[in-house]
């Protein structure tokens, strides 16, 4: 009886991970997570709860064909490697929840989701059901207090290093939110989700929040220099074409004019100066 129970437990554990083509799949307790190579030295992570992962993309281009190194290490651990980046997927015995850690080619930790469980019932992937089949989703990562974070678009704030900042993930008249950053640890991260939300770059944890979404979706790339990381990002989302010649030159730009006389004064001054 005891032997049969051990065999049954082993069969259940073995169902956590599977290799599906060029992707590593995790399934447990209604959650499905898919990790796959997405351009050079990069991995894309998608996940859902009680549904199938949706195909398609918001910003990422279709990846070029490439082979990933996938290893099912044991019942509770699997890895997937693409060039300079490796993801280690581990099932934690308490609660059987997944934790993903990203390493560079030297085996150094770049980024790691938080550990699950404990008295606070913490979860790296926290789904909160909403009406209509969507979720409010929070994804949490461990934070290196010495890490420096750069990017995220244009915000009305004075800090170049975003460590310690809280940012709204939404476009406004005074801000352009681009949820991608470059880390001083040697990686780039794209929150591939169009939902309005928030990001908190704390010194203890980094938390991404999507207020309404169907699935988890983020992309991580590794590089030896910021320029290499930016190059991977450009390859993943598409490179900006050269502006046509007729669009080059001086642009007269002002947020607003209060009346017609202000506009005419500008026009008169241009005419005066030739």
Where are these regions (language model features)?
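N-terminal accessory segment at the very beginning of proteins
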Residues: 1-247, 252-255, 262-268
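Short, intrinsically disordered, charge-balanced linker/junction segments flanking boundaries
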Residues: 271-274
């Amino acid at each position: 009886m005891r032997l049969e129970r051990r065999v049954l437990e082993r069969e259940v554990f073995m169902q956590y991970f599977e290799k599906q083509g060029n992707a590593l799949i995790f399934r447990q307790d209604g959650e499905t997570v898919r990790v796959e190579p997405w351009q050079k030295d990069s991995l894309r992570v998608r996940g859902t709860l009680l549904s199938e992962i949706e195909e398609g993309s918001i910003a990422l281009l279709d990846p070029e064909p490439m082979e990933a190194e996938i290893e099912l290490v044991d019942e509770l651990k699997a890895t997937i490697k693409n060039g300079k980046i490796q993801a280690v997927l581990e099932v934690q015995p308490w609660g059987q929840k997944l934790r993903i850690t990203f390493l560079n080619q030297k085996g150094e930790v770049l980024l790691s989701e938080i550990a699950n469980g404990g008295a606070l019932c913490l979860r790296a992937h926290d789904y909160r059901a909403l009406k209509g089949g969507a979720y409010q989703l929070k994804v949490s990562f461990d934070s290196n207090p010495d890490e420096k974070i750069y990017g995220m678009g244009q915000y009305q704030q004075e800090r170049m290093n975003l460590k310690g900042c809280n940012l709204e993930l939404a476009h406004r008249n005074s801000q352009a939110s681009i949820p991608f950053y470059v880390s001083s640890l040697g990686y780039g991260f794209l929150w591939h989700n169009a939902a309005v939300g928030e990001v908190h770059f704390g010194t203890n944890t980094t938390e991404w929040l999507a207020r309404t979404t169907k699935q988890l979706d983020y992309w991580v790339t590794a590089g030896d220099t910021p320029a290499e990381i930016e190059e991977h990002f450009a390859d993943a989302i598409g490179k900006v074409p050269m502006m046509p010649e007729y669009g080059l030159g001086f642009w007269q730009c002002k947020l607003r004019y209060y009346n017609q006389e202000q506009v005419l004064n500008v026009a008169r001054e241009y005419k005066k100066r030739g």
